[in-house]
Amino acid sequence: MKDVQNERDYRGIYLRKVGIKNIHWPIKIITKSGEYQSTVANIDISVDLREDLRGTHMSRFVEVLNGIDFLHPENLGKILQEVREKLKADSSHIKITFPYFIFKKTPVSQIASPNMIECVIEAELSKKLYMIIGVKVPIHTLCPCSKEISEYGAHNQRAIAEIYIKSKKLIWFEDLVEIAERSASAPIYSLLKRPDEKYITETAYNNPKFVEDVVRDIVSELEKEPKISWYRVEVTSFESIHNHNAFACVEKGWIKK
């Protein structure tokens, strides 16, 4: 059959990324404990395209995905190399977003329940392998200003802490989640009995944090790891008494002007 994708193109325009996106795919993730967790990922995968080629072979991306037994940051290089070879490209790229469940025990009743974290792995292979891993962690914040000016109580709410890093050594998703939760007013749990709810409410009240505080506390912990060469941290608070969200963010390498 005629291979239309391999026809010559004479417009002389190089394409940075060509591929498929928003494909949902069942995958297995290796956890920090060495076990496997099954989940469903949303995947974007692509290659570059030479200026003299009309198109790429889209089905080959799915063929590569079909051969993945499990996913781990340390085997992404092999996957991207296979993509590059199959598509005869100079660079290959992948972005994988998936729900990941971490079981936590409630602070008082000690009942384990799963908490969902959104995880991201984004990687590119050209001359070198570049990789970013990230998490979106639900947390609890309590407003220091509200506590200070009120005779009793303070407004508090759920928030999301986003942490993205480049690291020269493996940093587990669980490690990033722990950093986010330690930096919050209190963690979030799927299940809370009354003694747990009391404990969390009082913990948050005794540990008030602005979104600015949470971001700075997260960054302070990331800076302790010399193998982390880049990070981006953003915290968004779903304000309970305002008709807007509050956020703060920072990226390593930003220059103050």
Curated annotation (Swiss-Prot):
Annotated transmembrane regions: none
Keyword Zinc: no
GO biological process: tetrahydrofolate biosynthetic process
Catalysed reaction, written as an equation: GTP + H2O = 7,8-dihydroneopterin 3'-triphosphate + formate + H(+)
Site (May be catalytically important): 143
Keyword set, alphabetical order: Hydrolase
InterPro entries referenced in this protein's UniProt entry, alphabetically: GTP_cyclohydrolase_FolE2 (IPR022838), GTP_cyclohydrolase_FolE2/MptA (IPR003801)
Molecular function, one GO term: GTP cyclohydrolase activity
Pathway info: Cofactor biosynthesis; 7,8-dihydroneopterin triphosphate biosynthesis; 7,8-dihydroneopterin triphosphate from GTP: step 1/1
The EC number(s) this enzyme carries: 3.5.4.16
Main enzyme class: hydrolase
Keyword Transit peptide: no
Similarity section: Belongs to the GTP cyclohydrolase IV family.
Functional summary from the UniProt entry: Converts GTP to 7,8-dihydroneopterin triphosphate.
Protein name: GTP cyclohydrolase FolE2
Lineage per the UniProt record: Bacteria, Pseudomonadati, Dictyoglomota, Dictyoglomia, Dictyoglomales
Gene responsible for this protein: folE2
